[in-house]
Amino acid sequence: QGGVELLIDALKTAGGGTWFRVAERQGLDHLVRERQIIRSGREEVAKALGEDPQNLGPMLFAGMIIEGGIIGYDTNIKTGGRGARLLGIGKSKRYQQDVVTVSIRAVSVLTGEVLLNVQAKKTILSYGGAGDIFRFVDNATTLVEYEDGVGNNESVTYAVRTAIEAAVLELVYQGHDRGYWTIKEEENE
């Protein structure tokens, strides 16, 4: 869930917002229903005024559909840590790496052919540290135990967004290399 919204944002911001024209398809049912309401309202007003109804312009169509999804989330790809304890006083650190993988493909609307297909991965890093004390005091009759720690986890949403943006960029490069589109160079002034 949410991958479509991140893909739309990546497409709309690629090349400063000039590389892709994105047509709404995720909420197409809502869009079509709203257009029917507008059309019906215009027909009623025009009929009451004895005029022809004002037409609603055509929807934007796509020559290419870009779709895909999150195809993998692998946990504990790499884990580790270290620690030491002396006379009941210790310190430790740990880390873990997960990987999210996304796949995006460009499909020709005219032929149904998959023109381009790319995958991108992003590592998600988690790490933490802790310190502790475990000691008997007062002639070994009282136990003192203290632990403290902190952990940091990279945002999974950020990782998915980064992987999608990398996949869109790779899609642009592959499409350019295969002649599906050209990238207009900005003029130096």
Where are each of the predicted segments found?
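Glycine-centered flexibility motif
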Residues: 57, 88-90, 179
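Mixed-charge, low-complexity intrinsically disordered segments
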Residues: 37-47, 77-97, 131-148
